[in-house]
Amino acid sequence: LSRDPLAYVGKTPLTGNRAAVEMLKASDLVLDLMTLLFSAEQHEILEAGGRILLVVEPPEILVRMTPTEEDRTKVLTASARLRAAKTMTVTSSAGTDATFALGQYPILEEYGFVDKPGRWDHWPSGFLATWANEGTAQGKIVLAPGDILLPQKSYITSPITCHLENGYVKAIEGGFEAEHLRDYMESFNDPEVFAISHIGWGLQNRAHWAVMGFYDGEASIGMDPRACAGNFLWSTGPNNEAGGERDTACHIDIPMRNCTVKIDDETVVQDGKLTGDYA
């Protein structure tokens, strides 16, 4: 459907190329310039102890968000709290009110460098995520004008309401943009594209919400809005990178502004701003 590397995930030019896979498994560090995310080959390389660093953004974005030890400390501090949490609640003045049970899946800690065997990361980054327990995502998420759809790389202009039930998006309501999103997801002919995937929030102060609008759609994959400090980032589709069984090819990332995110009773994001030790 698209040349965007994240518009169809799981199968890559490396798929079925055993000689290349074995060579990469024997390597200490793999710089991924083609996006192996969600592929069986990536899992195999990581399980062999290889380190993978995904690097696909334009040079000026890489320079602006060159990872630092401070990024790592910030992500790991928030991760320790998320790891102990049992629930995540997200609300917004636009009408979002959703809950997710936690604990079944690991934490995704993205701080931009790979400092131990078997670790995957993405430069640039600076955010934290996990996956909701299977079947537990409930409520509704209301995308407001200015929120972003990826890989479409579009700022929406009118509200889109996603109704969550038992871990899936059961209905998508709104105007043309809601219809466009629904049509795109349905084109994969796979009910698993509507499953809730990772959920979390951005921690990177050097990421900027407005930057994506200055790039051609194929020049960037949109790491600025994914990592932007204080966003709520949620997604649909596969969870195989977390040890789950969903291997669908459609993965939608949706960074949102102006949300309040709570883990258990602690507010980590208030109206789109990081709070306390997370700021």
Per-region residue spans from a language model:
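Short intrinsically disordered coil segments
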Residues: 117, 215-216, 250
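Internal helix-turn-beta structural module
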Residues: 219-270
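Short conserved micro-motifs at the rims of enzyme active sites and ligand-binding pockets
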Residues: 153-154, 210-213, 245-247, 273
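Active-site proximal loops enriched in glycine and acidic residues that flank catalytic Cys/His/Asp
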Residues: 143-145, 164-166, 173-176, 203, ...
